[in-house]
Amino acid sequence: MKRTLLKMILSSSCLLYVTVAVAQNDLLLKNYRPVSIYHTPKTLVSKAAFPVTDMHSHDFAKTPEAIAQWVRTMDEVGVKKTVILTYSTGSGFDSVVDRYGKYPEHFLFYCGFDYTGFGKPGWIQHAIAELERCYKKGARGIGELGDKGEGELYSRPTPGVGIHIDNPALKPLLQKCAELKMPIVIHVAEDQWMYEAADSTNDGLMNSAHWHVNMNKPGKLGHDELLVSLENAVKENPKALFVACHFANSCANLDVLGRLFDKYPNLYADIAARYAEVSPVPRYTAAFMTKYKDRLVYGTDMGDQAKMYRTTFRILESADEHFYEKDQFSYHWPLYGLHLPGDVLKKVYGENAEKIINYKP
């Protein structure tokens, strides 16, 4: 009897081992959904500690009903104003302004650049005229311009293929932005994870695989070259005000952005859509944001849902530890609250945005 029982136990143990081993071998990282077992505080920040201006959002609401719901959500969570980066000129820009026109206190609009006919005689005059027209229609800034190495491809309807922000041909346009007091919001490069091989050593998988930057294309600028192009434009246009998106995509080394802040008073950066990149290193990030509290602005770039806003508030305000937001951010790593002091939050949430919106060259 004892021998039979022992065999049954050994058999069950082997079966359990095999089952676990198979499960381990079959588990894909994209399906990994860890749940924290730590009994640590779970803070719900229903409303931001100070009034918020979201300096980086887009045209997420496509119907009057959706816009009305967005406004209700903003009021509920404490976002008093949202900047909609339309990318667009022409009728595309006009249609966004018209659709949101019922809520002038809640939304600001930024337009793109018009590259139609770039390189041909008269292009710059046309581009400036369209910029002025957009300004009269309601544009109060430029953005989001975007260059991941192949030129400023975000602008609509005509992207600036091969045109980087420091291209001398753009200088009259940048000068006109300064004259009209229109800040220039620009996305250059991507974060370091997106340039690394999508292999077992990349701690940003699977998100880095999704946003991977292919550097095999001839003439494509890399991360450091794109940061140089941004610096050139900021340096050569001191009366223009620039806002680098996403911590200038330097989350793995915020000192890169800090060096630019130290040199150029006309440069700011938003923190949009990089909460998951910086919250795994909370002490480093909090120290950086405290040091440069006058140069950073809140942004989301992640939709219009209340849960999204509250997740960003939790990261900025709480001291929560080791929690996951896989569905929001796509990373498998745990997040940590930055527990920023009130004076930092007040500036990042709203005061710096007011300086940008009302800046005088």
Language-model features and meaning:
Residues 56, 74, 134, 142, ...:
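Conserved, mostly hydrophobic/aromatic
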Residues 1-13:
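Bacterial N-terminal signal peptides that target proteins for export
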Residues 52-57, 82-84, 107-112, 142-144, ...:
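Hydrophobic faces of well-ordered beta-strands that scaffold small-molecule active sites
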Residues 59-67, 84-94, 116-125, 164, ...:
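Acidic-and-aromatic substrate-binding clefts and catalytic sites of carbohydrate-active enzymes
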Residues 63-64, 71, 218, 224-232, ...:
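H/E-rich (His + Asp/Glu) clusters that bind or coordinate divalent metals
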Residues 18-19:
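N-terminal signal peptide c-region/cleavage motif recognized by signal peptidases
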Residues 26-27, 40-43, 94-212:
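Active-site gating/metal-coordination segments in enzymes
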Residues 24-105:
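An N-terminally biased module of ancient metal coordination in phosphate/nucleic-acid-related enzymes
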